[in-house]
């Protein structure tokens, strides 16, 4: 057996890959004297998803550093947070969480015997704890409590009192679990600073707080247990993983708001220390990255294509999920999963009258606001060699700013004054500091010698003319496509260039009133 790690080595293990540490000097002092006592809590709400591998990998680090680690299944918190977990399902949810999190830890080689597991209601309903809740409520302002839970507790128009209690209970957990530190996501920061402010008011000591970064969901927003579209469930089938990754936002050259790339950075690299891009030999073969920054650089330069990135993530992710799927492929755990998360369609309605908005939204091409545009100016992005910044006339009072990754594929002079096809109702987002107000649609052939061509409107088209799929010309486009609903991504999965170089959705042509949308030469290509 090797020598025990030094205090400095323990500090490195405890803090690596974290986004922020509050109380680092106190942490150093504790490590000089004894082992650190730390807890990680999770509210037992929606099904845990693949981003939970981020805290799992840190728990592995804590154990390597000799820490005494407690995992709290915060069932009472799950109920207090706008009843994300109904009272009658709390026990079942705790059991589900315990089984799935233990399976995750085993999947990455963490020894369970070194961990302590505890349920919130095992001590949060005691006389002493309840009295401290009242004591805390006598010194905490409504403003501070609401502010503390703003990024964690579900925000609604008429918030319940229970949501205001949530941060105080999480603060008290630090005292009642007798720990030196609490570990959580950066979204917990306001609760952590709340605890640092108010625990001393009750005569309790201020704890150390360790925060990991949040992994963006597949839509680019925070990955959430309670939002199905944003995440991959730990028990998703392989075909579901493929489907969700295929629809994930992963624009060529765009490293911002890229859920797929962020998952590699925050989950796969910390667990495996390397990542392999899987490619056919004719496209250059496999390439192994041992540093995330190198992968990000190649993706930004469009050396790595989104299709190869997604396929490689799919393979790596399924290797992590296979042991978890196998564990849950038993009658007892299948029954537990069904009982803890009953099918909503089989539940009795809670209120009289028909449910509003019960019909699923149609995902049809008419929801896209696609227009003919004319490029007025085109310049290199000041901070990204692979990006252009274009001013495009789309028939509005002022031209729109659009950022596109075409530098390596289309000379600047070919874009100047060119008629193009622009998706106009995406949510604006910053790309390397410049806000893009649309997407210039292009055909592409993937591979090591990737080819890209902007789509061409029919000759004689004018800026602002409506582009539609034949048969869907009458519909009203969404004012703004909501990223969480992934309308564009779902439709894009069926975009294709025909053998006649016509842009199509499900083999039906994209058109204007003057004819079909086309590209110059990329038969059988994709559209993005």
UniProtKB/Swiss-Prot annotation:
A motif ('KMSKS' region) lies at residues 222-226. InterPro entries: aa-tRNA-synth_Ic, NA-bd_OB-fold, Rossmann-like_a/b/a_fold, tRNA-bd_dom, Tyr-tRNA-ligase, Tyrosine-tRNA_ligase_regulator. Keywords: Acetylation, Aminoacyl-tRNA synthetase, ATP-binding, Charcot-Marie-Tooth disease, Cytoplasm, Disease variant, Ligase, Neurodegeneration, Neuropathy, Nucleotide-binding, Nucleus, Phosphoprotein, Protein biosynthesis, RNA-binding, tRNA-binding. Its EC number is 6.1.1.1. L-tyrosine binds at residues 39, 166, 170, 173, 188. Residues 339-363 are annotated as: Disordered. Changing residue 308 to Y: Found in a patient with proximal-predominant motor neuropathy; likely pathogenic; loss of function. The modification Phosphoserine is found at residues 205, 386. One of its GO terms (biological process) is apoptotic process. Its main location: cytoplasm. It is found in: Cytoplasm; Nucleus. It is linked to Charcot-Marie-Tooth disease, dominant intermediate C: A form of Charcot-Marie-Tooth disease, a disorder of the peripheral nervous system, characterized by progressive weakness and atrophy, initially of the peroneal muscles and later of the distal muscles of the arms. The dominant intermediate type C is characterized by clinical and pathologic features intermediate between demyelinating and axonal peripheral neuropathies, and motor median nerve conduction velocities ranging from 25 to 45 m/sec. Neurologic, endocrine, and pancreatic disease, multisystem, infantile-onset 2: An autosomal recessive disorder with variable clinical manifestations and severity. Main features include cholestatic hepatitis, poor feeding, poor overall growth, and hypoglycemia apparent from infancy. Most patients have variable global developmental delay, sensorineural deafness, retinal abnormalities with visual defects, and hypotonia. Some patients have endocrine abnormalities. Brain imaging often shows dysmyelination, thin corpus callosum, cerebral atrophy, and white matter abnormalities. The nuclear localization signal, which mediates localization to the nucleus, is also important for interacting with tRNA(Tyr), suggesting that it is sterically blocked when tRNA(Tyr) is bound. This is Tyrosine--tRNA ligase, cytoplasmic. The gene is YARS1.
